[in-house]
Amino acid sequence: QRGYQWEDTIVKRFKKTENWKAFRLGSPSIALPDVLAVNTKQSTIFTIEAKSGTSTSLPVPADQIERCLEWIKTFDIYKNKQVLLAFKFLSKKRIDVGVYKNRELREFFKIWDETLEITDCVCTYDGKIYSKINGERKELDLKECKMPFKTKQRTSA
């Protein structure tokens, strides 16, 4: 449910932005990115994997990154093609079952680096991204995407 709302929010923000179109692509049972956003004037396409939650870290499985990459590769007519990992840390942090603590709502839109090996990865509340290989975490230097709409992105952590 939360994931759906976050995807819906992203789509609505793009739709309110001039020259952008965005769509939710489907259910979790189908191997599609969560959101597809295009700007034909700027020849730009984003495939977006959206994650939201109340924990201190949000994981993205490797296969979800892979399917986003597969999708943008099929749209070779676009000059700018990027996979974005969109993270929303809700303003309530879950401490225990049914127990929450207030915190700042944070959003991060990270650009997947296509030169990297595709791995499971995780984004932390401070906006750092780590790959997870055989249980070991390694920090990844993924750039923050400047979105064409207003966000709760932090310019510096």
Locations of the language-model features?
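Short, charged, amphipathic alpha-helix that recurs within catalytic cores of restriction-modification
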Residues: 56-85
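Domain-level recognition of nuclease-like catalytic cores that cleave nucleotide substrates
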Residues: 1, 82-157
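Short, solvent-exposed loop/turn segments that connect beta-strands within catalytic domains
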Residues: 40-44, 77-80, 92-95
